[in-house]
């Protein structure tokens, strides 16, 4: 995974504020992890930033510490995984506890919805059968298991009275569960990401080991799922488009799984080109309007995560965070020209229209005419307001 320093350099090329995932795995105290994340950012970021707190199974100590950390640090969002048993997967009991704590504080629980236990069994079955190709990453993580986990998370959140944010939704099965819950009045929000809207499962079946470049979780789905995602965005049943940035170089990283698909590091480089991809494939093709585009990548997220109205709008009293976007620029995406610290691009060779050309943070240029003019260390840590988060988001 890219370091915080490297991420801030190329995040600032397209973005005014980031919320980074603070990893707590392996730490006895949540506060220790948060301190480490502050140290990573100190003096290095040219844009404003905050944290999502990522938790695994809660110990009695971390369970007691969680409310205090969220309040002290102004963190309004906790992420929990229902997959990755060996690393991050939480039990349903921990997930429910997180929902209860979040409900009492007015925080949001972000959930990676896949049935990790069943996926692990399917992976072992494929390995025993001698399958090692990247395509089996997708075949062992079927959409039905994303849909099942999404429904389970929705019901647990509802019982706890909490607000749920389903991250990186990929498929019709999960979309249908979110729509059904929202129609019943549940506080559920959904996010998808550029690759799920524009790439499909066939990318993992490329000759040789090229498919490893497209291994992330949840996996890419068959192409027909894309229409369901676009339609859900248009209908505001999915509210945001996130980056899900987590890149690994092909050489030396992705290649670790050349003889075993389950050892390919999960993640891809999406952050830099996401605006151009979404504008070209969404706005330019008439799937969403320019105003909907802005809402999905900025305003709705600011409301859900307690940044609004400081961020996510241009208004008196708000931060003058502005991205100037030229809709007429045409360019070809390539790893040879991108700014990300990774040796490939999943959109290599794509011709796109539209590009951010200047970025202002609190009224000061960070990028001007595509050149970095910001000051490292000028980015500020943004504390967000608990209690107001869910209320601000209710009209989304």
Q: What are the language-model segments listed below?
A:
Residues 1-44, 61:
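Metal-associated gating/positioning segment near the N- to mid-region
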Residues 61-241, 246, 257:
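Histidine/acidic residue-rich metal-binding segments in metalloenzymes
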Residues 15-17, 47, 75-76, 239:
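Short acidic/polar active-site loop segments enriched in Thr and Asp
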Residues 256-260, 316-382:
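C-terminal cap of metal-dependent C-N hydrolases
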Residues 1-2, 22-24, 50-61, 139-144:
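Active-site mouth loops of central-metabolism enzymes
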Residues 10, 49, 78, 112, ...:
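Divalent metal-coordination and catalytic microenvironments
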Residues 132-161, 213-214, 240-241, 247-328:
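His/Asp/Glu-enriched, well-ordered alpha-helical/loop segment
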Residues 30-47, 96-111, 273:
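Alpha-helix-loop-beta-strand connector modules within alpha/beta enzyme cores
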């Amino acid at each position: 995974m890219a370091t915080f320093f490297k991420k801030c350099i190329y995040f600032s090329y397209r973005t005014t504020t980031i919320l980074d995932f603070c990893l707590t795995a392996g730490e006895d105290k949540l506060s220790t992890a948060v301190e480490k994340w502050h140290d990573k950012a100190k003096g290095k970021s040219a844009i404003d930033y905050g944290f999502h707190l990522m938790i695994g199974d809660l110990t009695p100590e971390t369970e007691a510490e969680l409310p205090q950390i969220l309040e002290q640090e102004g963190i309004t969002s906790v992420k929990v995984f229902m997959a990755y048993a060996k690393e991050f997967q939480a039990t349903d009991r921990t997930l429910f506890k997180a929902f209860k704590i979040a409900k009492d504080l007015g925080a949001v629980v972000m959930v990676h919805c896949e049935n990790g236990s069943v996926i692990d069994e399917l992976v072992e079955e494929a390995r025993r059968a001698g399958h090692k190709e990247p395509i089996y990453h997708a075949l062992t993580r079927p959409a039905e298991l994303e849909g099942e986990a999404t429904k389970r998370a929705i019901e647990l959140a509802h019982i706890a009275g909490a607000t749920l944010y389903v991250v990186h939704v990929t498929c019709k099965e999960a979309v249908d569960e979110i729509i059904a819950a929202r129609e019943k009045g549940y506080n559920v929000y959904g996010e998808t990401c550029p690759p799920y809207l524009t790439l499909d499962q066939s990318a993992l079946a490329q000759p040789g080991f090229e498919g490893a470049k497209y291994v992330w979780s949840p996996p890419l789905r068959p192409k027909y799922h894309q229409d369901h995602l676009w339609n859900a965005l248009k209908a505001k049943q999915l509210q945001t488009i996130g980056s899900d940035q987590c890149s690994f170089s092909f050489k030396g990283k992705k290649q670790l799984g050349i003889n075993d698909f389950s050892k390919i590091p999960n993640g891809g480089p999406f952050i830099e080109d996401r605006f151009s991809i979404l504008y070209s494939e969404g706005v330019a093709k008439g799937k969403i309007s320019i105003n909907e585009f802005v809402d999905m990548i900025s305003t709705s997220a600011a409301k859900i995560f307690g940044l609004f109205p400081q961020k996510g709008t241009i208004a008196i009293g708000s931060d003058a965070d502005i991205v100037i976007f030229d809709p007429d620029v045409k360019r070809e995406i390539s790893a040879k020209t991108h700014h990300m610290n990774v040796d490939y691009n999943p959109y290599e060779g794509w011709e796109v229209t539209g590009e951010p050309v200047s970025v202002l943070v609190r009224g000061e240029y960070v990028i001007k005419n595509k050149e970095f003019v910001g000051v490292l260390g000028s980015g500020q840590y943004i504390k967000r307001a608990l209690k107001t988060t869910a209320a601000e988001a209710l009209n989304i």
